[in-house]
Curated annotation (Swiss-Prot):
Annotated segments matching region Disordered: 1-31
Residue ranges, compositional bias (Low complexity): 14-31
Domain of life: Eukaryota
Gene Ontology terms: biological process: sorocarp development
Organism of derivation: Dictyostelium discoideum (Social amoeba)
Biased composition (Polar residues): 1-13
Name assigned to this protein: HssA/B-like protein 55
The family this protein is said to belong to: Belongs to the hssA/B family.
One Pfam family this sequence matches: Coiled
Gene name tied to this protein: hssl55
């Protein structure tokens, strides 16, 4: 992610961003740099929601992951695009 796109993600947290969300061992969700952007966009608070969806090759599905600093997050889904919302 370039600095410009990172700044854009931070300043416009509810806009869809094209970053890959990948599962890690089927139990831990790795949201990469976009997770950091979402966290920063929400002021570094304790929680935020991260909604993702993917459409392609005849497959349409959506997924929503909630992150909490105390509980962490988990998932086993790989998704291609996402939107974060401060809570």
């Amino acid at each position: 992610m370039t600095i410009l796109s990172a700044i854009t993600s931070i300043s416009r947290p509810n806009k869809s961003s094209k970053s890959v969300v990948s599962s890690n061992g089927g139990s831990s969700l790795s949201m990469g740099s976009n997770s950091v952007s979402c966290f920063n966009a929400c002021g570094g608070g304790s929680s935020y929601s991260y909604s993702s969806s993917y459409s392609g090759s005849g497959l349409d599905y959506s997924y929503k992951a909630n992150y909490s600093s105390s509980n962490g997050y988990n998932s086993s889904v790989v998704i291609a695009s996402s939107t974060c919302h401060c809570s």
